[in-house]
From Swiss-Prot:
Increases viral DNA accumulation. Enhances infectivity and symptom expression. Keywords: Host-virus interaction. This is Replication enhancer protein. One of its GO terms (biological process) is viral process. Belongs to the geminiviridae replication enhancer protein family. It comes from Indian cassava mosaic virus.
Length: 134
């Protein structure tokens, strides 16, 4: 959903993509929070934020685009190591597809968390997407 207007994002807007080699450094990855075994749980909770860079947003017709993924995992990774593996694997998946869009990023994250990084229990996604109005 567009955060400014409240309108739903159409399938065409979500699938609108650009070749990955046309945009250098298309994504910015950041770990927002890492809770080590909170409340005597047997899981770590890691919140990862993916931001689209200016050139990618311009190519896709977006004003702003952030995706937050809250990951519950039974692994006990170091924060920097989890981020490095996550970023590398997401970019590797997108490079194999050749196209980067909102949908392909969600598919790449799902692939990495459930097929590459073992120990993922569940993932919650939230996003902030604002389309260009003009």
């Amino acid at each position: 959903m567009d955060s400014r207007t409240g309108e739903l994002i159409t399938a065409a807007q979500a699938m609108n993509g650009v070749f990955i080699w046309e945009v250098p450094n298309p994504l910015y990855f950041k770990i927002i929070q890492h809770d080590n075994r909170p409340f005597v749980m047997n899981q770590d909770i890691i919140t990862v934020q993916i931001r689209f860079n200016h050139n990618l947003r311009k190519a896709l017709g977006l004003h702003q685009c952030w995706m937050d993924f809250k990951v519950w995992t039974t692994l006990q990774p170091q924060t920097w190591r989890f981020l490095r593996v996550f970023k590398t694997q997401v970019l590797k998946y997108l490079d194999s597809l050749g196209v980067i869009s909102i949908n392909t990023i969600v598919k790449a994250v799902e692939h990495v968390l459930y097929n590459v990084i073992h120990g993922t229990d569940r993932v919650e996604q939230s996003n902030l997407i604002k389309l260009n109005i003009y």
